[in-house]
Amino acid sequence: MPKYRSATTTHGRNMAGARALWRATGMTDADFGKPIIAVVNSFTQFVPGHVHLRDLGKLVAEQIEAAGGVAKEFNTIAVDDGIAMGHGGMLYSLPSRELIADSVEYMVNAHCADAMVCISNCDKITPGMLMASLRLNIPVIFVSGGPMEAGKTKLSDRIIKLDLVDAMIQGADPKVSDSQSDQVERSACPTCGSCSGMFTANSMNCLTEALGLSQPGNGSLLATHADRKQLFLNAGKRIVELTKRYYEQNDESALPRNIASKAAFENAMTLDIAMGGSTNTVLHLLAAAQEAEIDFTMSDIDKLSRKVPQLCKVAPSTQKYHMEDVHRAGGVIGILGELDRAGLLNRDVKNVLGLTLPQTLEQYDVMLTQDDAVKNMFRAGPAGIRTTQAFSQDCRWDSLDDDRANGCIRSLEHAYSKDGGLAVLYGNFAENGCIVKTAGVDDSILKFTGPAKVYESQDDAVEAILGGKVVAGDVVVIRYEGPKGGPGMQEMLYPTSFLKSMGLGKACALITDGRFSGGTSGLSIGHVSPEAASGGSIGLIEDGDLIAIDIPNRGIQLQVSDAELAARREAQEARGDKAWTPKNRERQVSFALRAYASLATSADKGAVRDKSKLGG
């Protein structure tokens, strides 16, 4: 029977000092012996996805205390990728994931907490907390802040839905008037919550459902809706039950590594492909799997991508649907239900509620459930009122979207595409693979060949795109922006958005060893591995080289002879200490970022730290 970790600091005469300090936090004699549960919050006023979380930790803590536990709350950092986008701030985004994971480990292990409730929401916060949870392997439940309502505005006598990406594109489009750009900007992000499309934050919060570490509704129920409060109340109660099951009944099924098993990771990736999630999810799932010591690699993702259809299409791949529409159609469980009926899921998995996949679907799939309360929860909709307050409205759709032929979520027979929303490509400058969000690629450019325009920084590429130096048919290559080369593997949302602004969204490709925002669509290929800074062949591409992209056949090829590539590699190596670095780039890199770069691996490894360099 495992002993409560917290007993290390609460029992024994030699821990009198520790108990004295615990008493100073409000604990009493009656609390020593109860499980100490960390409420890992991420409230910050910098991020709309987190601005409403200030009081939600207290909400969870009250339920923990009522159920017989002791709750202790702390906060992690949280970077807003949208605000950090397009300048040096983006260098810090991905490295913040490792800082978050480490800070959770530091706090939980330093104070010997027994379990956690992770209150996350945005891009790197959920992955960082997920990595920490699987590293620590103590009972955990995730409950996110929830999605933002979609923006809405009237243009040309028509009400249209908007999000952050629309504001970016229109702001850079010279054909759009100042007044229209201002109107879109003011309407794009109307409420608290994670940005309203199937961007990275919402993708990851959906995947925690598929991994079994969060409750049904976590990924899609709006931040503003009163129904979301119940997820926080339930999490506080349930974590005490899971904690006691493990420590008092020796039930290891309550541990995250047993819930988020290899089968669960495969289900999560299957969901990701079917819903056309952000390419960043590949990076984060690979990283989380390593923390869980699960053999889950790019090869597994490639195999799944070849057999899983696209059953859901959401912004940025279409402006018709946002997360509020996914929820109305049944949310994550609705998509999992269709995948299960198609025979594409591992059924022998459980979630934090203790339910198997079939039991979860029977209870929560809107196509199966007889529970009116569940159906009512999935009718929770937007209010259209600007707010930064959680649970501030209780509007409902008149009906569910259960149209699996023409609705937001489709059945296998009516799939948007027989190929899923993500694909892994391989070729002579992406030997370890690269990722494309096929959900956002127009059918006309699934095969594309063009001359390379090579840039050694995102800034130079943006200047060229906006300056008219990139023309239809070009393949824009942005290198030395990987985890090590950037450092920090910047997101390329501005270059891809500006290609659209210049009318080139369906006429050009963009390839990078960096990554993309979940808001990116178009022929945008990222995570090229190995990255240029690690000696990857993307560092050998020259202006004018032809690059052939073949998504249906999962290929990407630099049309240069092996002999020529060998000669270029020899010339690169001859640069000595300057080999595999940008030739003409001045970038101030802080010590903190240099420390990150010194251990960073390429994207095919999840951009995690290279343990071999630390003797691990």
Swiss-Prot record:
Keywords on record: 2Fe-2S, Amino-acid biosynthesis, Branched-chain amino acid biosynthesis, Iron, Iron-sulfur, Lyase, Magnesium, Metal-binding
GO cellular component, as recorded: cytosol
Keyword Glycoprotein: no
Catalysed reaction equations from the record: (2R)-2,3-dihydroxy-3-methylbutanoate = 3-methyl-2-oxobutanoate + H2O; (2R,3R)-2,3-dihydroxy-3-methylpentanoate = (S)-3-methyl-2-oxopentanoate + H2O
Pathway info: Amino-acid biosynthesis; L-isoleucine biosynthesis; L-isoleucine from 2-oxobutanoate: step 3/4; Amino-acid biosynthesis; L-valine biosynthesis; L-valine from pyruvate: step 3/4
Residues modified as N6-carboxylysine: 124
GO molecular function annotation: 2 iron, 2 sulfur cluster binding; dihydroxy-acid dehydratase activity; magnesium ion binding
Binding site for Mg(2+): 81, 123-124, 491
Gene Ontology terms: biological process: isoleucine biosynthetic process; L-valine biosynthetic process
Keyword check for Ligase: no
Catalytic machinery residues: 517 (proton acceptor)
InterPro entries linked to this entry: Dihydro-acid_dehy_C (IPR042096), DihydroxyA_deHydtase (IPR004404), DiOHA_6PGluconate_deHydtase_CS (IPR020558), ILV_EDD_C (IPR056740), ILV_EDD_N (IPR000581), IlvD/EDD_N (IPR037237)
Cofactor note: Binds 1 [2Fe-2S] cluster per subunit. This cluster acts as a Lewis acid cofactor.
EC assignment: 4.2.1.9
Binding sites annotated in the UniProt record for [2Fe-2S] cluster: 122, 195
Cofactors required: [2Fe-2S] cluster; Mg(2+)
Subunit description: Homodimer.
Function: Functions in the biosynthesis of branched-chain amino acids. Catalyzes the dehydration of (2R,3R)-2,3-dihydroxy-3-methylpentanoate (2,3-dihydroxy-3-methylvalerate) into 2-oxo-3-methylpentanoate (2-oxo-3-methylvalerate) and of (2R)-2,3-dihydroxy-3-methylbutanoate (2,3-dihydroxyisovalerate) into 2-oxo-3-methylbutanoate (2-oxoisovalerate), the penultimate precursor to L-isoleucine and L-valine, respectively.
Assigned protein family: Belongs to the IlvD/Edd family.
Protein name: Dihydroxy-acid dehydratase
Organism: Escherichia coli O9:H4 (strain HS)
